[in-house]
A protein has these predicted regions:
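Internal helix-turn-beta structural module
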Residues: 46, 304, 311-419
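Glycine-rich anion/phosphate-binding loop at the beta-strand->alpha-helix junction
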Residues: 196-297
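Glycine-rich, mobile lid/loop segments that gate access to catalytic sites or pores
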Residues: 6, 48, 66, 73-243, ...
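Conserved phosphate/anionic-ligand binding catalytic regions in large, soluble enzymes, centered on
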Residues: 8-10, 14-19, 115-130, 242-267, ...
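Alpha-helical support elements that line or immediately flank enzyme active sites
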Residues: 12-31, 129-148, 276-300
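A short glycine-rich, hydrophobically flanked beta-strand micro-motif that places a catalytic Asp/Glu
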Residues: 37-41, 165-171, 231-235, 301-312
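Short, charge-patterned binding micro-sites
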Residues: 39-58, 313-317
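N-terminal, positively charged regions that mediate nucleic acid binding
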Residues: 1-40, 155, 409, 415
Length: 419
């Protein structure tokens, strides 16, 4: 029987994402000047105020206020009427030194014996329903907001947009679990107060349907067939949305973990990513399990897979690895037998040190993850510039989204006897 499935996304100007981006900008700057930095940084944003709190062990000294303001400026909070503005907002730092009790559980005489930074379970998921092995509903929700942000920055076709926005996409699937059409789209976007309420809302809905949607279809033609004249559009369904961003809602690091991952598909262990250096397995192991899942599906082992790993704090070896193929495996093995083989593959060594080395996680690569999802993104090398409080600048070439590489497909095929 056909069924519906829904995923949501939020824009870079959503208050929780503002917090995520500030936290990850701090991570990047610490790692740029001291690759062995240990950092856990939480951010709170509200009307005219940013609060930074967390624990750090690093040789680097940063101007955290300027880093936070730079992120806010880049997002687009640059007008006083937003009641949260890069130049004038207060920035309070309560960042202090990391506990020695925690650090002793991570550091070892032998790097290879580095313990997990915490206990917990992490999940990686992949499906072949899209070219980047991500759930389609989430992909579409991200694309809508990426294009909406592009329209805001261009300030040509739509001139009233403000940074805060959310989207939601509902897909209809057939009996074979294949997406066949978009059933509903929700877009809520912050905007200037430019006309009477009813006239303003009618204009926004018209622009979303006639400008944003065609732009998404043109830029992503592989999705175009899913759009149809029966889509139910809900554009700013609560009414006008002038007051938004951190002035409308307080934002906190780590509150959009489903947007960050798989949009409700698969599973989530509960640990957020942003603001954590890679010694925290909440982040590094979630990336590593995504890397495993994507390579398994790309190799043709299965159509869909969920990989779980778990750790005890201070212990290098995982306490468990679990694989679920949802009955789509192409080999005559149980999911447990597949997991056993994966555990023995050097290219999927799940000890924290080896994850860091394999995925190059000690590089300043995290700011780009903090909006529009950590998974399914483009693996590429970029040059980034970082400036210390004394004015010293360094340039770094950084490989982004290393966990999206399909560099283990050949080995998976060999181990599982796939052609």
């Amino acid at each position: 029987m056909p069924y519906l499935f829904t995923s949501e996304s939020v824009s870079e100007g959503h208050p929780d994402k503002v917090a995520d981006q500030i936290s990850d900008a701090l991570i990047d700057n610490f790692l740029a000047f001291d690759a062995q930095s240990k950092v856990a940084c939480e951010t709170l944003v509200t009307t005219g105020q940013v609060v930074l709190a967390g624990e750090v062990k690093s040789k680097a000294y940063l101007d955290v206020q300027e880093i936070a303001r730079g992120v806010i400026r880049k997002i687009g909070y640059t007008k006083s009427e937003y009641m949260f503005e890069a130049h004038s907002c207060g920035v309070l730092s309560a960042i202090h030194e990391q506990s020695g009790d925690i650090n002793q559980g991570v550091e070892r005489k032998k790097k290879e014996e580095q313990g997990a930074g915490d206990q917990g379970m992490m999940f990686g998921y992949a499906t072949n329903e899209t070219e980047d092995y991500m759930p389609l509903a989430l992909n579409l929700a991200h694309k809508l907001l990426e294009e909406l942000a592009a329209l805001r920055r261009e300030n040509k076709q739509i001139k009233y947009l403000r940074p805060d926005a959310k989207s939601q996409v509902t897909l209809e699937y057939d009996d074979n679990n294949r997406p066949v059409r978009i059933d509903a789209i929700v877009v809520s976007t912050q905007h200037d107060d430019f006309a009477a309420d009813e006239k303003m809302l009618a204009k926004i809905k018209k622009d979303v349907i006639n400008i944003l949607i065609p732009r998404v279809k043109a830029k992503y033609p592989k999705y175009a067939h899913l759009f149809n004249n029966k889509i139910k559009y809900h554009v700013n369904p609560t009414g006008k949305f002038v007051i938004g961003g951190p002035h409308g809602d307080t934002g906190l690091t780590g509150r959009k973990i489903i947007v960050d991952t798989y949009g409700g598909k698969g599973a989530h262990g509960g640990g957020a990513f942003s603001g954590k250096d890679p010694s925290k397995v909440d982040r590094s192991a979630a990336y590593a399990t995504r890397h495993i899942a994507k390579n398994l599906v790309a190799a043709g082992l299965c159509d869909e897979v969920l990989v779980q790993v778990s750790y005890a704090i201070g212990v290098a070896q995982p306490t468990s690895i679990n694989v679920v193929t949802y009955g789509t495996a192409k080999v005559d093995l149980t999911d447990g037998q597949i997991a056993e083989k994966i555990m023995k593959m050097p290219c999927f060594d799940m000890r924290p040190y080896f994850i860091e080395q394999r995925l190059k996680l000690r590089n300043p690569m995290y700011s780009e993850t903090a909006a529009y999802g950590h998974m399914g993104r483009k693996n590429e090398v970029v040059e980034k510039t970082f400036t210390s409080p004394d004015g010293k600048s360094i340039k770094r070439k950084v490989e982004l989204f290393t966990w999206e590489k399909l560099d283990a497909v050949k080995e998976v095929k060999k181990v599982f006897g796939l052609k």
